[in-house]
Amino acid sequence: KLSVTSSVFGMGNYTNTVVDLNRGNSLINLESNIVEEGGKTSVLTASISGENYVKNLVVNNINHAPHSEAYMTNFGIGYDEGKLVVDGVGDIRNGAHGSVNKQHSTMIVFDELAKATNKPLLLIEEDDVVANHASAVGKIDEQTIFYLCSRGLTPKQAKKYISLSYFKPVLAYLSDEEIKESVLDYLEEVIKDD
């Protein structure tokens, strides 16, 4: 279990990056509060759930102040019988006019028994704001895999490169090369040949 609450003051800019490679059940709660005008927060997450594990991720970005910005990017992979649930909450409070709150989540499922769920929620108490969410959950498109294979890749390589394209924005924020290598090794392990 991991719980992180942050507050952004003034013109502060806070980025929270979480990569969950835990081989077990997990519950992660991330909350970012922008409490003064002009603050900005970005939350980026990546999670892999396999075997029969259940991963729950709750991300809550709260605009308390006017002209503040909150961004959320979540990426997940489910394989075997793993379950992945992402609750993304964008919350623009009364008085936070001129604010932005955006979220984007993509979940890829590799196996029939794996499940991924994304539950975006926007709570808006103010006018004159920009708020949106985008969500994609499902298997990798077979036509995309076919196209990449027609260019010389194996199905496993195609899945790996597609997965990496989603993980890359999260990995770019990690300065520890050993952690980046762990993510790549884990992806190699969970992506099976067809």
Q: What feature does the model see in each segment?
A:
Residues C149-G152, K156-K159, S163:
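Well-ordered alpha/beta subsegment
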Residues K1-F146, S150-L153, P169, L174, ...:
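Conserved beta-strand/loop scaffold segments within soluble protein domains that form the structured core
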